[in-house]
Amino acid sequence: MPGLPEVAPGDDLAKLIAAVEPGLVDGDVLLVTSKIVSKAEGRIVRADDREAAIDAETVRVVARRGALRIVENRQGLVMAAAGVDASNTPSGTVLLLPEDPDASARAIRDGLRDTLGVDVGVVVTDTFGRPWRTGLTDVAIGAAGVRVLDDLRGGTDAYGNPLSATVVATADELAAAGDLVKGKAAGLPVAVVRGLPHVIAGDDEAGARAMVRGGRDDMFRLGTSEAVREAVTQRRTVRAFTDEPVDPGAVRRAVAAAVTAPAPHHTTPWRFVLLESAESRTRLLDAMRDAWIADLRGDRKTEESIAKRVRRGDVLRNAPYLVVPCMVMDGSHSYGDARRDAAEREMFVVATGAGVQNFLVALAGERLGSAWVSSTMFCRDVVRRALGLPESWEPMGAVAVGHAAEEPRDRPARDAGAFIEVR
């Protein structure tokens, strides 16, 4: 659509479009670049405020590489620099995305209906990069009067095969098609698609916000480096689980991660006993409970106090899956004096702890909750008898594993300075 003037803050885009006599008819779809929408809405800031503007528009950082930030903005869009852009704007300024692109699209649609009496769809477009693909394309960030998604699930293809996952991003396809004629530097910020009346919808149709995938469904929520860092802090102690079964394959993958931990003398001091049957879990927990009660009675605790303490073990009893990590000291050195022999054992204990931590972190990566409980360390002989383990295996607690009954709360970051001494 040639002939549009330079857009300034306060301009009515519908009137500007109508003024160039575009010959619009019912069923047309207007593809409007977000740049002119931002200009009309006064979303212009000084270029030296760019970083502050990105900060203000950012909800979370998805990935960072040097000065480049891929972020999620307040509309849920994941894009470079929160869409703050220095192109197609006067030198010394940058443009922010429209505050509410769907509302912007509705305003243009309503304005054209009032001015020209036509029923058209409007898609506000912006340029996005894409994971796994080189190059840019336009996508829909706002829409009105357009079926933004075409859900084909439940139908069949030409061969009669069921369609179970096909949801076509119609608004994005329209945006990309429009970019072929608008270009990035041709001074043509609006294009018209004609001949697709089936994509036109009523005023109550969802806008482009419906195309934003929610966090719980996002398999690629973080960049690679960010995901690796966050995986460590995702681990939580989970004490309540659902009845959903635990995938044994996920636990075995976590064990594979666990045994990459550092260990002394090129040894492998970890063993993980997987209690996958209810019978084995009950046998162990009953034996440990009896040993605990005997210890508490030896401490002259009251029966009421004993019952209260024993209930703390319910986190293990209520878990659908248990793992008993054990330390083995095969390959350890004997020095013949207490000081060095104690240090040798401590090395193996530290290595076992590193393996257990790897295991817990990997479980979190598998979306499994866990709780490490120390109890098996207080009755190792009992545990070995109940599980038929060799005398050389030293139980180092137990890990309850399952699907968390509720989403763990965010944990505030700790100030590392409180734990650091520099010399």
From Swiss-Prot:
Residues binding FMN: 263, 374, 411
Gene Ontology MF terms: coenzyme F420-0:L-glutamate ligase activity; coenzyme F420-1:gamma-L-glutamate ligase activity; GTP binding; metal ion binding; oxidoreductase activity, acting on the CH-CH group of donors, with a flavin as acceptor
Keyword field contains Magnesium: yes
Keywords annotated in UniProt: GTP-binding, Ligase, Magnesium, Manganese, Metal-binding, Multifunctional enzyme, Nucleotide-binding, Oxidoreductase, Potassium
Substrates-to-products reaction catalysed: oxidized coenzyme F420-0 + GTP + L-glutamate = oxidized coenzyme F420-1 + GDP + phosphate + H(+); oxidized coenzyme F420-0 + FMN + H(+) = dehydro coenzyme F420-0 + FMNH2; oxidized coenzyme F420-1 + GTP + L-glutamate = oxidized coenzyme F420-2 + GDP + phosphate + H(+)
Domain of life of the organism encoding this protein: Bacteria
EC assignment: 6.3.2.31, 6.3.2.34, 1.3.8.17
InterPro entries: F420-0_g-glutamyl_ligase, F420-0_gamma-glut_ligase-dom, F420_FbiB_C, FbiB, Nitroreductase, Nitroreductase-like
Pathway stated in the Swiss-Prot or TrEMBL entry: Cofactor biosynthesis; coenzyme F420 biosynthesis
GO BP annotations listed: F420-0 metabolic process
Pfam families: F420_ligase, Nitroreductase
Cofactor(s) listed in the protein's UniProt record: Mg(2+); Mn(2+); K(+)
Region ranges (Dehydro-coenzyme F420-0 reductase): 224-423
Binding site for a divalent metal cation 1: 85, 126
Chain sites annotated for binding GTP: 4-7, 34, 39, 88
Binding residues annotated for a divalent metal cation 2, in chain numbering: 127
Positions with a binding annotation for coenzyme F420-(gamma-Glu)n: 295
Family: In the N-terminal section; belongs to the CofE family.
Function: Bifunctional enzyme that catalyzes the GTP-dependent successive addition of two or more gamma-linked L-glutamates to the L-lactyl phosphodiester of 7,8-didemethyl-8-hydroxy-5-deazariboflavin (F420-0) to form polyglutamated F420 derivatives, and the FMNH2-dependent reduction of dehydro-F420-0 to form F420-0.
Protein name according to UniProt: Bifunctional F420 biosynthesis protein FbiB
